[in-house]
Design a protein with these regions (language model features):
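Bacterial N-terminal signal peptides that target proteins for export
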Residues: 1-9
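Bacterial N-terminal signal peptides
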Residues: 8-18
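Boundary at the C-terminal end of the N-terminal hydrophobic targeting segment
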Residues: 20-22
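Active-site-adjacent pocket scaffolds in enzyme catalytic domains
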Residues: 27-57, 165-169, 173-268
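Active-site beta->alpha N-cap acidic-glycine motif
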Residues: 31-137, 144, 256, 296
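Generic enzyme active-site microenvironment
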Residues: 67, 139, 305-308
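Metal-dependent polysaccharide deacetylase catalytic core of the NodB/CE4 family, i.e.
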Residues: 99-102, 106-186, 220, 226-243, ...
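C-terminal domain-boundary segment and adjacent tail
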Residues: 107, 200, 212, 252-321
Length: 321
């Protein structure tokens, strides 16, 4: 029953996740593509060298990188939804959830990464400064949670640079990593990431281990910290109020899945990347499972809790070996 419920959640939320969006690739329908076209599309961005340190810094066995995508109101605004009710869900992320999350991280003594759309930073500059003051990382997450695959190359470049400048000004730190909104990639996203000389990306899914990204068959020097939908809170707890089917997964079921993911990462001496959203994980019944998950991972020996930039630097050191 649990497996069936989890699968239904993914199917019902696919449109909201952007999984059925038409890509702005300029390519003909797949059945009309030549073999050369297929090979070019598939080979545009690929996984390269495994960059897993053996061991991780401090002699640790596994790295744990917890992240929060601080979307707040941006996804609603992106879609043209200006309903005060809809926007209030985003406000919850900053007003109610963020204090809980920061207190939880303080209590456990761990640092995390917060991927922030620039519009969120402009709406809540004091929240961003509080995050930085506690020693957490601020990473890029688009301007207003736009879908990169629906933008032209120049539009995407302009928004990415504007996002970088905004985050740097408000946070007082220089972002070195990006998580694209909705993990959406255009054919030129990696090209722009390289132009901006970012250290890492955390949007692709070719592995669970950190790896070097290949662009058009060539090494980029960009570290990928892979993500995966089963390691994201939104597919389990997100809700579209206008959908005829509204999924709800018991928090303990999700906790059980994430524990199993960590157990295998631990056995493989690999990397555990968790993606959450303050306005989702920060609710009372859900912050509890994050607390339990962290406590569970802390109970094991040789676990390194680190910010994404710290993990990426440890992985990047493998490029020189």
């Amino acid at each position: 029953m649990k497996k069936r419920t989890l699968r239904l959640a993914f199917l019902m939320l696919a449109p909201a996740l952007g999984l059925s969006q038409t890509q702005n690739t300029g390519q003909p329908p797949a059945w009309q593509m030549s073999w050369d076209q297929i090979r070019t599309v598939v080979g545009k961005v690929r996984a390269g060298k495994d960059l897993t340190p053996k061991p991780w810094p401090g002699g640790n066995r596994v790295a744990v990188a917890i992240s929060f995508d601080v979307d707040n109101e941006t996804t609603s605004l992106r879609d043209g939804n200006t309903s005060p009710s809809e926007l209030s869900q985003g406000e919850y992320g900053s007003r109610t959830a963020m204090p809980r999350i920061l207190a939880l991280l303080d209590r456990h003594g761990i640092k995390a990464t917060f991927f922030v759309p620039a519009v969120t930073a402009k709406l809540y500059p004091e929240t961003i400064r509080q995050i930085v003051a506690r020693g957490h990382e601020i990473g890029m997450h688009g301007w207003i949670h736009e879908r990169n695959s629906q933008l032209t190359e120049s539009q995407e470049r302009d928004l990415m640079r504007k996002s970088y400048d905004t985050l740097r000004e408000i946070s007082g730190t220089r972002p070195v990593g990006i998580r694209t909104p909705s993990w959406d990639y255009s054919p030129w996203t990696m090209k722009i990431i390289r132009e901006m000389k970012l250290l890492y990306d955390s949007s692709l899914m070719a592995d669970e281990r950190p790896y070097e990204v290949l662009y058009e068959g060539k090494p980029t020097g960009v570290v990928e910290l892979p993500v995966e939908w089963i390691m994201d809170d939104y597919p389990y707890f997100g809700m579209n109020r206008f959908s005829t089917i509204r999924p709800h997964i018991g928090p303990e079921d999700v906790l059980d899945l994430w524990r199993k993911e960590f157990d295998v990462a631990y056995d493989e001496s690999s990397l555990f990347v968790l993606t959450t959203h303050p306005h989702i994980i920060g609710h009372r019944s859900r912050i509890v499972i994050l607390d339990k998950l962290i406590a569970y991972m802390k109970s094991r020996q040789g676990v390194w809790f680190a910010r994404h930039d710290e993990v990426a630097r440890a992985a990047a050191a493998q490029l020189r070996k």
